[in-house]
Amino acid sequence: SEKDRMYRVLGRIRRFQREHGSVQVKSRWAYAKRLNTELGRKIAGAVAGYAEENHADVIVFEYLETKGKISGRKKQKLHLWRKRDIQKRCEHQAHRRGMRISRICAWNTSRLACDGSGTVVRDPDNHSLCTFQNGKRYNCDLSASYNIGARYFIRELLKPLPATERSLLEAKVPSVKRRISCVYADLRELFSEMELLRAA
């Protein structure tokens, strides 16, 4: 895949840098950056295209802190830069197609299980898989995606409500107060409580 290709290029740069020093590696980093730009363009197009095919109104992203200088190793800089680039390109494409972009707090979306069982344990051999506290095996990215979507819907469900009704729901589902720990299970519980409140 394109992602694997990028990792191979970064591996070759790392080996070359160890053997020849950092001065002679500039052209190789320039190639990696061009490859990164192309990868960002393809991913952004695929995301916007998929959203349009499925008649989505909104594309939800994790909020990335984009102010100030990016610190850290070049590999980390490149990775964060691609995330920013993808979001920016997606935003332009989404607006052209009549869709909105929304961002939610990124904290703990990957660390917490979508079923509300607690923190996940990453598989040491396959980093894309994890184990929930209840023993369930799950895909890490899928669990995080559920949590990202849940945080968006929790915010959108609570925002238009009168203060008294919102406070009542937050008392019944206390976890929705802290957005940094909201998961998909909290959305389901909130929705059930809203249905009961309407039926009363």
Feature locations, PLM:
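Positively charged, helix-rich recognition surfaces that bind polyanionic ligands
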Residues: 1-200
